[in-house]
């Protein structure tokens, strides 16, 4: 039975879809004005794993991930580069799809562009106005009257009083309340014509939040089974989505809300101002990815390493990007592939009665705990290495496929060079050096102190697959030996 952590209730809940056997998922996607960065990679891979597991569990999944193709940042990019808005968005959508292919992220069932749903957005604004939740200000903008919606803040846990204390009304603002947010932006004379739509409120364009309310309702209906997104979307974007959709139609927008954890760079938030901003293509391109070319050739070994780096951590846990962590991920993935290189897999399919398949299933049914699932993969790799067991190798490859991993031919995989492999590392599992073993043991100790037992188990399994046995002693000490 599947259990999912619900951001709304702040608890794990037994998953019960609205319609038996069917799952409707809406995930907030990209605003396409630049290349996708590593934080985007985490969101893309995390929800790809979610939909893969739901399908593997027998559900009929309708997965929608939108594209925001009208936004102030897009308009600025178009003006700065002398291009039309759709030229900017078409280019970066193509670039995003190139990143997804490299990371083995499956395309969603629907990938709506916001500009195709402006009519539906205007309809929702009209409903909100009729319900007393929207008003047109003196400057022509249409704003949402936040205090008119009972329950605002229920997702983020923020009270109106707390929000009010941190807000200030901008000079010249015609909002009735500083908490109000824009639903429809009135057109400015200097803005390009293609950014303006006619409406009952005059020419203008939609606000960001209203876009997702329109697309999710139009494509999936209400309530959604699952609504997901990145960690920074909980407030205000998702909070505002709830206010819009429920304020317009009543009922519930989504039964379960999922948010993946942040991806940090050297323990700091990734930002261009800090100089630690890194795109997906910078990380995995074969050679230098050329600016101005949406498509690129990814290094297949490095690309799967980046996916593995994300999958080996629980989707809700914070994740830290460092060069050393990528080396660690590459070495670990190499060990899984080495097990498959040593023994030809029996391709009979998954035997769900087998112990490690059961462990894998239990982990994934526990809030999509891919870290625990990866631990099961390392247990199987250890079995393959010890026993030269072709059925275990088949299980390893088949379960890896559920996570979008281990589908390359091992011989071809190892023919690709990698920038993220330890100097002098031998491919054989038994060649892990003492310094690396001690580092993993220290990381395991920290994981246990943080009560991240899935990660601790995954490290033990990884070491066992490399032929390293651990012996935990009283007082927190751990000794190791080569098997």
Swiss-Prot record:
Name of protein: Cysteine--tRNA ligase
Residues bound to ATP: 272
Reactions accelerated catalytically: tRNA(Cys) + L-cysteine + ATP = L-cysteinyl-tRNA(Cys) + AMP + diphosphate
Motif 'HIGH' region location, chain numbering: 30-40
Disulphide bridges: none
Source domain of life: Bacteria
Any one GO BP annotation for this protein: cysteinyl-tRNA aminoacylation
GO MF terms held by the record: ATP binding; cysteine-tRNA ligase activity; zinc ion binding
One Pfam family in the UniProt entry: tRNA-synt_1e
Source organism of the structure: Bordetella avium (strain 197N)
Ligand binding (Zn(2+)): 28, 212, 237, 241
Similarity remark: Belongs to the class-I aminoacyl-tRNA synthetase family.
Subcellular compartments: Cytoplasm
GO cellular component, one term: cytosol
Matches recorded under HAMAP family: Cys_tRNA_synth
NCBIfam families for the chain: cysS
Primary subcellular site in the record, as a coarse category: cytoplasm
Keywords assigned: Aminoacyl-tRNA synthetase, ATP-binding, Cytoplasm, Ligase, Metal-binding, Nucleotide-binding, Protein biosynthesis, Zinc
SMART domains the record matches: DALR_2 (SM00840)
Motif 'KMSKS' region boundaries: 269-273
Keyword ATP-binding: yes
Needed co-factor(s): Zn(2+)
Enzyme class: ligase
Subunit note: Monomer.
Cofactor: binding comment: Binds 1 zinc ion per subunit.
Enzyme nomenclature, EC number: 6.1.1.16
